[in-house]
Curated annotation (Swiss-Prot):
InterPro entries: Ribosomal_uL3, Ribosomal_uL3_bac/org-type, Ribosomal_uL3_CS, Transl_B-barrel_sf. GO terms for biological process: translation. Part of the 50S ribosomal subunit. Forms a cluster with proteins L14 and L19. Residues 132-153 are annotated as: Disordered. The keyword RNA-binding applies. Belongs to the universal ribosomal protein uL3 family. Methylated by PrmB. One of the primary rRNA binding proteins, it binds directly near the 3'-end of the 23S rRNA, where it nucleates assembly of the 50S subunit. SUPFAM superfamilies: Translation proteins (SSF50447). The gene is rplC. Keywords: Methylation, Ribonucleoprotein, Ribosomal protein, RNA-binding, rRNA-binding. This is Large ribosomal subunit protein uL3. It comes from Enterobacter sp. (strain 638). GO terms for cellular component: cytosolic large ribosomal subunit.
Length: 209
């Protein structure tokens, strides 16, 4: 089953009939318009390409305009692709609504996490700080040794060090679907999802459900 592209609206909470408070993220999933269907004969794999939302005409490049015109759909804010499972069929120009998730219990949500800028190891990797006193001078938040000796004589790849934090692709798995509001194009999932308000999210049925 394919996924859908939505936009993060924000967080709120809803109450069950028993009075239990459930924290939810509201995702606006406008109709995803099919712009291209890829097949084994022409592309070597089966997939569906979609767009959603809208984009100013002045912001649409000529190649994009041609691509959208060929599909007969309004220019959207981007293009996304989902692999097709055996038996799944879509046609160019078709609209796919949030009702796709009506029977889905859990979803995986992918987004771009909020950027935090250049961060040290304490904030970025949860390193513990060194002694506040006992002779420690100006080394309270430094990472400490990053290597060994003449052997191996190098710093290993992937070593946790200071650097850019956030602003990376993150997937949160197996979030409960609390409500599907097809009338208002809203999907409510339990818990938090990556990204800032207004950012794009890819919602797929959970692989571990």
């Amino acid at each position: 089953m394919i996924g859908l592209v939505g936009k993060k609206v924000g967080m709120t909470r809803i109450f069950t009939e028993d009075g239990v408070s459930i924290p939810v993220t509201v995702i606006e999933v406008e109709a995803n318009r099919v712009t291209q269907v890829k097949d084994l004969a022409n592309d070597g794999y089966r997939a569906v390409q979609v767009t959603t939302g809208s984009k100013k005409a002045s912001r649409v490049t000529k190649p994009e305009a041609g691509h959208f015109a060929k599909a007969g759909v309004e220019a959207g804010r981007g293009l996304w692709e989902f692999r097709l499972a055996e038996g799944e069929e879509f046609t160019v120009g078709q609209d796919i609504s949030v009702e796709l998730f009506a029977e889905v219990k859990k979803v995986d949500v992918t987004g771009t996490s909020k950027g935090k800028g250049f961060a040290g190891t304490v904030k970025r990797w949860n390193f513990r700080t060194q002694d506040a006193t006992h002779g420690n001078s100006l080394s309270h938040r430094v990472p400490g040794s990053i290597g060994q000796n003449q052997t191996p004589g190098k710093v290993f790849k992937g070593k946790k060090m200071a650097g850019q934090m956030g602003n990376e692709r993150v997937t949160v798995q197996s979030l409960d679907v609390v409500r599907v509001d097809a009338e208002r194009n809203l999907l409510l999932v339990k818990g938090a999802v990556p990204g800032a308000t207004g950012s794009n999210l890819i919602v797929k049925p959970a692989v571990k459900a």
